[in-house]
A protein has these predicted regions:
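Absolute protein N-terminus
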Residues: 1-2, 221
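Ferredoxin-reductase
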Residues: 2-85, 139-140
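FNR/FR-type flavoprotein reductase catalytic core
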Residues: 72-221
């Protein structure tokens, strides 16, 4: 079901990632980690649907999306980068397979952090962060989405890796088999993986090879 909602606010949280807060229709609900298809309520764009993950809590009185904008071509995210409070977007039914199953390891690449933002915020709100660990890979330091909030929630368990900046203040290893073997002590825990398709496929395969139960590896299938 399609519903037209107004943008309440829009702000940049990195150089190319924008956080949108929208009106929340009465009765609209989701589980942290889930997504919806969104389009822009402008002629020619209403049917250009793209999936975006909620980054707010279900208990919030607004909907929030944290969206990486690609301005090098005239797609949906480029159009979204031009919108402001008062403009309208179209949201649809909720879907998604990324859902918290229990304590473990979150492995994210770039904008793949978004489903984990909602999950970690909910756990933090419930006082249930526990010993969950995050491995978050980006090209440069300035690409890290909401680094301060992630550090505040997870403390030493927020682990950032940078792949394309030699003077980074963070770990510069890639998340590969050697990294996983060095950093993960217990492959019987839950794993949550989100990022570019190739990364998700690669890491899911590596985790299985290293002894993770495939039923305990959560990603969008």
């Amino acid at each position: 079901m399609e519903q037209i909602v107004k943008i309440l606010s829009a702000k940049y949280v990195t150089h190319n990632v924008r956080q949108f807060r929208l009106e929340k229709p009465s009765g609209y609900s989701f589980i942290p980690g889930q997504a919806t298809e969104l389009s822009i309520n402008i002629d020619g764009w209403q049917d250009e649907k793209r999936p975006f993950t909620f980054t707010c809590l279900n208990s919030d009185d607004y909907l929030e999306f944290t969206i990486k904008t690609y301005t090098d071509h005239d797609g949906v995210t480029n159009q979204l980068s031009k919108l402001n409070a008062g403009d309208e977007v179209i949201i649809r039914d909720v879907w998604g397979a990324i859902e918290y199953k229990g304590e473990g390891y979150f492995i994210a690449g770039g904008a793949g952090i978004t489903p984990f933002l909602a999950i970690l915020r909910q756990l933090n709100n419930d006082g249930a962060i526990g010993n969950n660990k995050l491995f978050f890979s980006n090209k440069t330091d300035k690409d890290i989405i909401l680094a301060d909030e992630l550090k505040s929630m997870l403390g030493q368990n927020a682990h950032f890796t940078i792949t394309n900046q030699k003077d980074s203040i963070y770990d510069q290893r890639r998340i590969n088999a050697d990294f996983l073997k060095a950093e993960i002590k217990d492959f019987s825990k839950h794993f949550y993986v989100c990022g570019p398709d190739a990364m998700v496929e690669d890491i899911s395969g590596l985790l299985a090879e290293l002894g993770a139960d495939t039923e305990s590896v959560v990603f969008e299938r």
